[in-house]
Amino acid sequence: GIVRDDETELESALRTAVNNDGVDALVTSGGVSMGDYDIVKSVLSRIADMSWFQIAMKPAKPFAFGTLRNDDGVDVPVFGLPGNPVSSLVSFELIARPALEVMMHTADSMTGRRRVKGIIDYAVARQPDGKIHFDRCVASWGADGRIHVARVAAQASHQLAATALANALVEIPDGHGVGAGDEVLVTLLGAGGHLPTTA
């Protein structure tokens, strides 16, 4: 649920989740960066065993992982996602979801995401910054029988409406970009990573 920016309320909600609600894992969104209102970091640093990361990816640089021990002595995994909606989505799909699928023993099932090679149908110019960039895209079968990806219009990390149109994340390696027609790595976001079968 939603918790206000209040440390007492947040601590109570987290402890209730691990003690009364019987959760197997906690996923938080927001408050894990360096700002004045990033109280999730403040509270979890005090009550949990956490590690805080600045991951070399864009979007979704801030990320946290650790455990919060419940009253029965069980260490419950905690995934701390960034608060920006697109950053939160990307970090969940690429980091938290795979870990949760391993916990559920479903990593190789039909519900998992697939990472495949595809052809990018547009050029991306970028500058080296030490990060892997992830474009939100629409993947479909091309006439050549391969997966092709087209970019959704808006790529800014606050553009949730445009991101909702995407069914794939495309990896743009660190460097000077990729050209139209290049082969890229694609994470398919649909259940089981499936696309419509028609070309």
Language-model features and meaning:
Residues G1-I47:
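N-terminal small/polar loop signature for handling phosphorylated ligands or for N-terminal nucleophile
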Residues V43-A199:
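Flexible glycine/proline-rich
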